[in-house]
Amino acid sequence: MEHSGILASLILIAVLPQGSPFKIQVTEYEDKVFVTCNTSVMHLDGTVEGWFAKNKTLNLGKGVLDPRGIYLCNGTEQLAKVVSSVQVHYRMCQNCVELDSGTMAGVIFIDLIATLLLALGVYCFAGHETGRPSGAAEVQALLKNEQLYQPLRDREDTQYSRLGGNWPRNKKS
């Protein structure tokens, strides 16, 4: 039993550490993006701007222009059939604002100033009456409550009962 456990661990030790013999790096220098491989890089799909260092470094262009594509790292003489690939998808936020404490303080400060100016404007326009008050407002203030309404006479409760009472009516037959 002990020998089978040792044999299983030797198999795992031999199989697991076998990774890719290639070292693919995606780096950003200044404002450009580069794909670098320790053997040679091959372009399959996407953006390419230029090659450097005997096809070991590939310039993808400016990071602001969102470079993307699939790139292969070719095998060496010993491992000719082995290839390793990397997919690059760069997405830059061109319309973003960095939200730090200074920006937040500025937003809050400007918000308070705008609120105060709005309150001042409402106070100035609503607080003062322009012109003189209307004559109807003065007359109503002088009348007593019982004089506001005229009582109905002779049970004539329709609105237009007294208008044109003596006038002859035109009836067409």
Swiss-Prot record:
The modification Phosphotyrosine is found at residues 149, 160. Disulfide bonds join 37-73. It comes from the Eukaryota. GO terms for molecular function: identical protein binding; transmembrane signaling receptor activity. Residues 127-173 are cytoplasmic. Residues 22-105 are extracellular. Residues 1-21 form the signal peptide. It is a single-pass type I membrane protein. Its main location: membrane. Keywords: Adaptive immunity, Disulfide bond, Glycoprotein, Immunity, Membrane, Phosphoprotein, Receptor, Signal, Transmembrane, Transmembrane helix. GO terms for biological process: adaptive immune response; cell surface receptor signaling pathway; positive thymic T cell selection; protein-containing complex assembly; T cell activation. PROSITE patterns: ITAM_1. Gene3D superfamilies: Immunoglobulins, YojJ-like. It is found in: Membrane. Residues 138-166 form the ITAM domain. One of its GO terms (cellular component) is T cell receptor complex. Glycans are attached at residues 38, 55, 74. The keyword Signal applies. Phosphorylated on Tyr residues after T-cell receptor triggering by LCK in association with CD4/CD8. The chain crosses the membrane at residues 106-126. Part of the TCR-CD3 complex present on T-lymphocyte cell surface that plays an essential role in adaptive immune response. When antigen presenting cells (APCs) activate T-cell receptor (TCR), TCR-mediated signals are transmitted across the cell membrane by the CD3 chains CD3D, CD3E, CD3G and CD3Z. All CD3 chains contain immunoreceptor tyrosine-based activation motifs (ITAMs) in their cytoplasmic domain. Upon TCR engagement, these motifs become phosphorylated by Src family protein tyrosine kinases LCK and FYN, resulting in the activation of downstream signaling pathways. The TCR-CD3 complex is composed of a CD3D/CD3E and a CD3G/CD3E heterodimers that preferentially associate with TCRalpha and TCRbeta, respectively, to form TCRalpha/CD3E/CD3G and TCRbeta/CD3G/CD3E trimers. In turn, the hexamer interacts with CD3Z homodimer to form the TCR-CD3 complex. Alternatively, TCRalpha and TCRbeta can be replaced by TCRgamma and TCRdelta. Interacts with coreceptors CD4 and CD8. This is T-cell surface glycoprotein CD3 delta chain. It comes from Mus musculus. The lineage of its organism: Eukaryota, Metazoa, Chordata, Craniata, Vertebrata. The gene is Cd3d.
